Curated annotation (Swiss-Prot):
Family: Belongs to the SLC29A/ENT transporter (TC 2.A.57) family.
Keyword field contains NADP: no
Known role: May be involved in nucleoside transport.
Transmembrane segments: 20-40, 56-76, 86-106, 108-128, 142-162, 186-206, 265-285, 292-312, 327-347, 354-374, 393-413
This protein's name: Equilibrative nucleotide transporter 5
Origin species: Arabidopsis thaliana
Pfam family, one: Nucleoside_tran
Main location as per UniProt: membrane
Length: 419
């Protein structure tokens, strides 16, 4: 069965475009829970007005995410990727459903007790995020760049769709009794269904696509053990291939060597997410003041970020816009930090139009640079090395997000009633 795929060129295999669609949906599922939480932020500010929900929940999320990805990155070669990803999607599905149960149990009332439970649920989001994002990017690093680009684009699609649905539900229920709560609950219910769909797709559809079988079989022949369960799920039971001795298996670069060869990539990803998460979502909810859009203002800003992040992740498909020069990527990443004073002075002196423009630039550059790095970095490595590098790249994304969340609290310095 494996030999059938080993002698075929990837472009001649069926299922590439189906795989791209499935990868996009799986990308949506890996971030829709977190984006749902951000998008109903206006509701949580109504229920927990004294607890800085957007800042605190983001800060709670990150340690669980980082702790999990550190463990997975260190042990990636020994971990069953199929179980890892399935557990992640199942935890996502369960956790977002628990948000609905929590709200129904408390009847939408706040207090420190429900807030602590909310924080615990958000912690499980962090575990699931590290499990799925690291597992999927590591797995897709074994395959063609189009698949990892589709998955990463799906992360942005999650943000764009959740923002759009949130604006629709807010508009639909704004003038009804308890409308904000009803809109948030319907929104979370839709997100739960999306997560459940991802469980089914990853378990029963994705592993059976011919192009996915091809790349996983190729990775197994190069010594990758993480794909064995997925190959078995696809009906490839040739044990002589799955357990064959290969001299190259013992020659793979270790994590330290991979980091040294890709230090600019990991540092750039770290800096991209330090900047992004220092502004999103806390600054946009708490530091942008009152404008003509009223309670819609923060939601519109989040939506603009998400939509332009999505656009940025598809820009590399245009060849002359795909930045592959490593020095060029570093210059672009460092230039983004000019947005910090721009946001500060716009929040203080500018109007909502300028803020929307800055948020759009933040999203566009975040998506574009992320895809350029994730698609370029794994090239030239063996299957096991690609999987390891994929996990390391996600580790630095999440570490950057954590540092960014921490730095985001600095925006509260000098603000009245900040704490």
């Amino acid at each position: 069965m494996v030999a059938r795929f080993e002698n075929q060129a990837p472009e001649n295999l069926h299922g590439k475009y189906q795989a791209m669609v499935v990868c996009c949906i799986l990308g949506i599922g890996s971030l829709v829970s977190w984006n749902s939480l951000l998008s109903v932020g206006d509701y949580y500010y109504q229920v927990f007005p004294d607890y800085h929900p957007s800042r605190v929940l983001t800060f709670v999320y990150q340690p669980f995410s980082i702790g999990t990805i550190v463990i997975f990155a260190y042990n990636e070669s020994k971990i069953n990727t199929r179980k890892r990803n399935l557990i992640g999607y199942i935890v996502f599905t369960t956790s977002i459903f628990l948000l609905i149960i929590l709200d129904l149990a408390t009847k939408g009332h706040g207090g420190i007790g429900p807030y602590i439970v909310l924080c615990a649920i958000v912690g499980s989001f962090g575990f699931a995020d590290a499990s799925v994002r690291g597992g999927m990017i590591g797995d897709l690093s074994l395959m063609c760049p189009e698949l990892i680009q589709s998955f990463v684009a799906g992360l942005a699609v999650a943000g764009a769709l959740t923002s759009a649905f949130r604006l629709i539900t807010k508009a639909a229920f704004e003038k009804t009794h308890d409308g904000l709560r009803k809109g948030a609950m319907i929104f979370l219910a839709i997100s739960t269904l999306v997560e459940f769909l991802c469980v089914l797709l990853y378990a029963y559809v994705f592993p059976k696509l011919p192009i996915v079988k091809y790349y996983r079989s190729k990775a197994a022949s190069e010594g990758s053990k993480t794909v064995y369960a997925d190959l078995a799920a696809a009906g490839i039971q040739n044990q002589s291939v799955l357990t064959a001795d290969d001299v190259s298996k013992d020659k793979r670069l270790n994590n330290k060597e991979l980091l040294l060869e890709n230090v600019d990539y990991v540092v750039n990803l770290f800096l991209i997410y330090v900047l992004t998460l220092s502004i999103l979502p806390g600054f946009l909810y708490e530091n942008t003041g009152q404008h003509g859009l009223g309670s819609w203002y923060a939601l519109v800003l989040i939506a603009m970020y998400n939509w332009w992040d999505l656009v940025g992740r598809y820009i590399p498909m245009v060849k002359w816009l795909n930045v592959e020069n490593r020095k060029g990527l570093t210059v672009a990443v460092l230039t983004r930090f000019l947005l910090v004073p721009a946001f500060y002075f716009t929040a203080k002196y500018g109007d909502q139009g300028w803020m929307i423009l800055l948020v759009s630039i933040l999203g566009l550059t975040n998506g574009h640079l992320t895809v350029c790095i994730l698609a370029k970095a794994p090239r030239g490595y063996t299957g096991p090395e690609k999987n390891a590098l994929g996990n390391l790249l996600v580790l630095f994304i999440l570490w950057g997000a954590f540092v960014g969340c921490a730095l985001g609290w600095l925006w509260l310095i000098g603000k009245k009633n900040a704490f």
